[in-house]
């Protein structure tokens, strides 16, 4: 497969930016929904945008059920809100006075980093973190 810009994150619907860290069977995602590339992450992003980022948890549960080996760490942000999932891969958060960091893994030795358990949805808005099970 040739290297192409449309296959690289972040993907956007004009409002949200989205990245996917992991792997998923394209057949488990469903139709391409107008994806600009055939790579799994582009098809997954298109499915999420069609389903609505507000429904990210349900979309991840459906795809995870269809592909038990999927790794679906997704990060979506629109400038006001950040939504992330951990499904089969690591995710950590760091809450600080000047903001919240969400990352695949801690980037330093700060003891304030918190590892998020698998199969969780994380929402960050106005400096507040909410975590719910998937």
Question: Model regions: which residues?
Answer:
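Conserved short alpha-helical segments that host acidic/polar catalytic motifs at enzyme active sites
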Residues: 1-134
């Amino acid at each position: 497969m040739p290297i192409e810009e449309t296959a690289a994150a972040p993907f956007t619907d004009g409002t949200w930016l989205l990245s996917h860290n992991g792997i998923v069977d394209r057949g488990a995602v469903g139709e391409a929904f107008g994806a600009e590339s055939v790579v799994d992450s582009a098809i997954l992003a298109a499915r999420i945008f069609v389903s609505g980022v507000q429904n990210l948890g349900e979309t991840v549960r459906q795809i995870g059920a269809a592909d038990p080996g999927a790794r679906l760490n997704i990060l979506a942000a629109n400038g006001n809100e950040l939504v992330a999932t951990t499904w089969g891969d690591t995710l950590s958060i760091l809450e600080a006075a000047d903001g919240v960091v969400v990352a695949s893994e801690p980037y330093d030795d700060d003891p304030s980093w918190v590892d998020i358990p698998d199969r969780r949805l994380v929402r960050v808005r106005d400096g507040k973190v909410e975590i719910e099970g998937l």
